[in-house]
Amino acid sequence: MAAGPAPPPGRPRAQMPHLRKMERVVVSMQDPDQGVKMRSQRLLVTVIPHAVTGSDVVQWLAQKFCVSEEEALHLGAVLVQHGYIYPLRDPRSLMLRPDETPYRFQTPYFWTSTLRPAAELDYAIYLAKKNIRKRGTLVDYEKDCYDRLHKKINHAWDLVLMQAREQLRAAKQRSKGDRLVIACQEQTYWLVNRPPPGAPDVLEQGPGRGSCAASRVLMTKSADFHKREIEYFRKALGRTRVKSSVCLEAYLSFCGQRGPHDPLVSGCLPSNPWISDNDAYWVMNAPTVAAPTKLRVERWGFSFRELLEDPVGRAHFMDFLGKEFSGENLSFWEACEELRYGAQAQVPTLVDAVYEQFLAPGAAHWVNIDSRTMEQTLEGLRQPHRYVLDDAQLHIYMLMKKDSYPRFLKSDMYKALLAEAGIPLEMKRRVFPFTWRPRHSSPSPALLPTPVEPTAACGPGGGDGVA
């Protein structure tokens, strides 16, 4: 039962190179001569053909790639988690057990790279079909998804139910073994593409994990890739270069601005806590402090990023935006940061909350976003993930950076903060100098006096030759 990785025409392949590598492994595992041994497996009264055991999969991977059994088990578990191998006895548990548990290879039609992205309409048909077959006894998270999709695509729900009933009617004409196999295949596909709450999303991609390298690999042998490369180098040749004197001047300006704020270069005030055993420096520079130091307030003027990374500076900036009736911009940026770094199980809830509070028509804290960015954001909300609001967040960030941030630096509030900020006094080391031990009690070998050899005129008793 060999399978080829070619997707059906008209469906673009996902730019995810690790999926291509796993597909090549799965294809080699199904080789009739050198692949994993397949046999018919009996489940109760049903016989499932072309099944493999978990121990055979681990043994084949260990022999094929010359790795230990532990590494082979991990590789097999990754294949199961990505839906290329699915269990027959417990389809909801995507785990590889190195025993006689029966598994089966996923058909190429349900490979993630073939059907990506997964459409909401297909998921609604799957849930409707499962709801009819089980007479409403869905899992809790599937019930929530079913209700949400019912509200979201209510205009096409008759089509969803009609498709579900037609598929169930066609399934009755198949054998019991085929029905079981197709049900396991569909369930595995949706467990990978719509994981339950709390389960890891193996297909999640961050902005840094984009398909830049993968697209280059796919385009290496094409003429379009070489045309793009020639155009890139032509633009690079015509680009104006910055003189070295200008670069050095910028480096000197940067170092001169940041030098007083570097504790290694300019020291710490009131004292270095690692030397003086006094934590006053840490107390004055705590994340939340009532009266920030002058150096800390000055750093807010270096860049907008410095202001946002400081909790105290962000709080004062929020007060300033509140006076200008634009505090919803910073609140939206903070909500996007919470979504980006929050728990995976809370991503759908956080996305809905941000949309209802900031982006929905008539929202309580509606933010001003251009129509193009709003369309891209609404398109991404159909399949929510932690990076779905990146475009809108960047738009609001640049709006605050170019408009609100310069006015904040010129405002009376920031000038008053600079005037009221204090400079810590240097702490004296000790009251009694004779009780103070120097940091380096032993002198450096380079500073030790060099011994002088006695001359011939000197006697053995001393340097003057007197016995």
From Swiss-Prot:
Return the annotated region ranges for Disordered: 440-467
One biological-process term from Gene Ontology? G protein-coupled receptor signaling pathway
Q: How does it assemble?
A: Heterodimer with Gbeta5. Interacts with RGS7BP, leading to regulate the subcellular location of the heterodimer formed with Gbeta5.
Enumerate the InterPro entries for this protein. Answer: DEP_dom (IPR000591), G-protein_gamma-like_dom (IPR015898), GGL_sf (IPR036284), RGS (IPR016137), RGS6/7/9/11 (IPR047016), RGS6/7/9/11_DHEX_sf (IPR047017), RGS_DHEX (IPR040759), RGS_sf (IPR036305)
Recorded name of the encoding gene: RGS11
Protein's UniProt name: Regulator of G-protein signaling 11
**What are the protein's UniProt keywords?**
Signal transduction inhibitor
Q: Does the keyword Iron-sulfur apply?
A: no
Stretches assigned to the DEP domain: 32-107
Source superkingdom:
Eukaryota
Task: List S-S links within the chain.
Answer: none
Q: Name one GO cellular component term.
A: neuron projection
Q: What does this protein do?
A: Inhibits signal transduction by increasing the GTPase activity of G protein alpha subunits thereby driving them into their inactive GDP-bound form.
For molecular function, the Gene Ontology terms on record are:
G-protein beta-subunit binding; GTPase activator activity; GTPase activity
Describe the location of the RGS domain by residue ranges: 299-414
Residue ranges of domain G protein gamma in the record: 219-282
